[in-house]
Amino acid sequence: MQRSQRLSQMLFVTLREDPAEAELISHKLLLRGGFIRRLSPGIYTYLPLLWRVLQKISDIVREEMNAIGAQECLLPQLQPAEIWRESGRWDVYTQAEGIMFALKDRQGREQALGPTHEEVITLLARDLIRSYRQLPQILYQIQTKFRDEIRPRFGLLRGREFLMKDAYSFHANEESLRQTYQDMYRAYGRILRRCGLEFCVVEADAGAIGGPSAASQEFMVLASAGEDEILYTPDGSYAANVEKAVSLPPPAADSPYTTFQVLDTPGTETIEKLANFLKISPTLIVKNVLYQALYDNGLRVVVLLSIRGDQEVNEVKLANHLNRLAERYQANKLLKLTLADAEIQKSWQGDPIPVGYIAPDLPDSCLGRQKNLAPQILRLADQTAALLKNFVTGSNQVGRHVVGANWGEQYPLAEVVDVRKAQAGDRCLLNPDQILETARGIEIGHIFQLGLKFSLPMRASFTDEQGSEQPLWMGCYGIGVSRLAQAAVEQSHDANGIIWPVAIAPYHVVVVVPNVSDPEQTKVAEKLVQELAAAGIETLWDDRDERAGVKFKDADLIGIPYRLTTGRSLKQGKVELAERATGQAVEIPIEEVVATLKERIAAALAVPD
């Protein structure tokens, strides 16, 4: 990597105002600082300063991957549809999530731009791995990925094109997979620490990559503007993405009702209105929520979920449960789960539905006879609802509710599931003395134990020591390189601009010449740049014919860790050394500059294992 650069010769343009397109401060600063330029929604050019940052992050990733025995390769970005159909994920990625760019070539063959590479790597393993003697294997790549986001936003955090490291491991057994998973866990921690980031590791939902039963953890960079909510205990014993989190809900209040009654409750279509009308706690109410599930065979299934009135539905957990029921409906996968609004309910072409007053036994007659609509409602009850006695719920009549109801008496208890959304203030399931707290995070890394999810449908196998054919055990491990760069900015900035961690800063030091027409200032600056570069210190030389104030503002904006200024103190044989992170400035003798910076940079790069 180039050790020194004149700023006057760089393609370098900064902006004084925040771009209208940017919402997050990190996005604004990357645009204003001349790091990125938008081509179209979700697609950005990485300009020279950011490219240096990305190269440094990539180098750190490579070093840590190589240290655990992973081998770098490069996989095709253009992938044939048949391998995605073989794994069973083509419809999931093109219809359900709809995030894959799909196209047809001139021969009419379906292709896709890879959002991920499990299919490609599994096919490669199927072709090349024959024996247990070849295992384990870990391959990784760093390359551009593509995802057709519905609403690209937040700059590099949710783009349609992004830089990512993805690794894949193959094993003879589950024990070997778990060992590599732990190796990756430790390597990811080292990567983020070396990049100077504060992070936490959380239990996570495996999504379409791992499936509902895969072990999975996310590496979250803590930031108030993060898209993901994290629930954690103060003692650090538990942390999870809210999609995966479990907890103990607060106990329900005692019911004042001892007999079953039907009451007139006009104008109480919501839990809040009903609780106020009856002067009871929402914890005594069973609310009944309608969803429509679409499976990959085209069948729509209406789901009625009963849950305690003070709780919210975790739709990720619900979707995972419905995915496990796919075989019941002669399907392979759930494609889509949608809250049933008025338009969807109308499409069922059945009896009118008493919205706001639905009971657990809503009749199946609300479903018309249609070819692709299951004739019976799938009824589920969250644990919070299943435990209630003498509860309040709808009556299937507009303007009326029932009180004093019980499962097994007025209503049959449906299949009991755990699909409530854990929330801050709940007690921790593992240690009820700990109360869950909340934070925001940006997902940077995600590791999965895939098990046999891909090897079985794609017939990727090996011969074991006994000569028997066995499926390959598999793991996958991703880290967003371009996301990491922006997350660092989101976590480390001030009112004046970016504060890059030393390890991933585009340059270690910027040398500012306040007055380029002063030959002494220029001469000293040139000598310092040469000496710093020779000592391995990456140096940006601001030799532009600009006002000193502009140069200082730009230096703060782009966040170079150290700034040297060849100003008035030259008469005393000194230059000013300012640290971007602290704002502290000192004057040091010119002959001590190299040694001082080497010492400071070495200290900043020394990260404990």
Curated annotation (Swiss-Prot):
The keyword Ligase applies. Its main location: cytoplasm. GO terms for cellular component: cytosol. It is found in: Cytoplasm. GO terms for biological process: prolyl-tRNA aminoacylation. Disulfide bonds: none annotated. InterPro entries: aa-tRNA-synt_IIb (IPR002314), aa-tRNA-synth_II (IPR006195), aa-tRNA-synth_II/BPL/LPL (IPR045864), Anticodon-bd (IPR004154), Anticodon-bd_dom_sf (IPR036621), Pro-tRNA-ligase_IIa (IPR002316), Pro-tRNA-synth_IIa_bac-type (IPR004500), Pro-tRNA-Synthase_IIa_type1 (IPR023717). Keywords: Aminoacyl-tRNA synthetase, ATP-binding, Cytoplasm, Ligase, Nucleotide-binding, Protein biosynthesis. GO terms for molecular function: aminoacyl-tRNA deacylase activity; ATP binding; proline-tRNA ligase activity. SUPFAM superfamilies: Class II aaRS ABD-related, Class II aaRS and biotin synthetases, YbaK/ProRS associated domain. Its EC number is 6.1.1.15. It catalyses: tRNA(Pro) + L-proline + ATP = L-prolyl-tRNA(Pro) + AMP + diphosphate. CDD domains: ProRS-INS, ProRS_anticodon_short, ProRS_core_prok. The keyword Ligase applies. Catalyzes the attachment of proline to tRNA(Pro) in a two-step reaction: proline is first activated by ATP to form Pro-AMP and then transferred to the acceptor end of tRNA(Pro). As ProRS can inadvertently accommodate and process non-cognate amino acids such as alanine and cysteine, to avoid such errors it has two additional distinct editing activities against alanine. One activity is designated as 'pretransfer' editing and involves the tRNA(Pro)-independent hydrolysis of activated Ala-AMP. Belongs to the class-II aminoacyl-tRNA synthetase family. ProS type 1 subfamily. HAMAP family: Pro_tRNA_synth_type1 (MF_01569). Homodimer. Consists of three domains: the N-terminal catalytic domain, the editing domain and the C-terminal anticodon-binding domain. This is Proline--tRNA ligase. It comes from Synechococcus sp. (strain JA-3-3Ab).
